[in-house]
């Protein structure tokens, strides 16, 4: 169930403050965050945000098509190593 439109998007306060400070200064430094639940808003366009995936911070460059999604969607938490190869020759013996 999506968030109500009358509430507006959720962005952690500390994250939006860091983005606003960089927008005013005109800098585009990497912003580290653990807030995977924050929604990407238009103020974040062009910034690189390093989102924590539980182990490391994954850099995410925010583009226009990402607006409305959450930061955690672009930082995968699980590593897929692939399925085990089906070795039929060894099963015959």
Swiss-Prot record:
Q: Does the keyword rRNA-binding apply?
A: yes
State the residue spans of region: Disordered. Answer: 74-93
Keywords, in A-Z order = Ribonucleoprotein, Ribosomal protein, RNA-binding, rRNA-binding
Tell me which domain of life the UniProt entry assigns to the organism this sequence originates from. Answer: Bacteria
What GO biological process term is on the record, naming one? translation
Q: Which residues fall in a compositionally biased region of kind Basic and acidic residues?
A: 83-93
The cross-references to SUPFAM superfamilies, in alphabetical order and at most eight, read: Ribosomal protein S19
Q: Which terms does the record give in the GO molecular function aspect?
A: rRNA binding; structural constituent of ribosome
Q: Extract the Pfam families matched here.
A: Ribosomal_S19
Q: Which GO terms describe its cellular component?
A: cytoplasm; small ribosomal subunit
The free-text function statement in the UniProt record for this protein reads: Protein S19 forms a complex with S13 that binds strongly to the 16S ribosomal RNA.
Q: Which family does it belong to?
A: Belongs to the universal ribosomal protein uS19 family.
User: Which HAMAP family does the entry mention?
Assistant: Ribosomal_uS19
Protein name stated in the entry? Small ribosomal subunit protein uS19
Organism this protein belongs to: Streptomyces griseus subsp. griseus (strain JCM 4626 / CBS 651.72 / NBRC 13350 / KCC S-0626 / ISP 5235)
Taxonomy, top ranks, is: Bacteria, Bacillati, Actinomycetota, Actinomycetes, Kitasatosporales
């Amino acid at each position: 169930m999506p968030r109500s439109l009358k509430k507006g998007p959720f962005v952690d306060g500390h994250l939006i403050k860091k983005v606003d400070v960089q927008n005013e200064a005109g800098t585009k430094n990497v912003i580290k965050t653990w807030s995977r639940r924050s929604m990407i808003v238009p103020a974040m366009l062009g910034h690189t945000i390093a989102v924590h995936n539980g182990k490391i911070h994954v850099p995410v460059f925010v583009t226009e098509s990402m607006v409305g999604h959450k930061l955690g969607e672009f930082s995968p938490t699980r590593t897929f190593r692939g399925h085990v190869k089906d070795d039929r020759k060894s099963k015959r013996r």
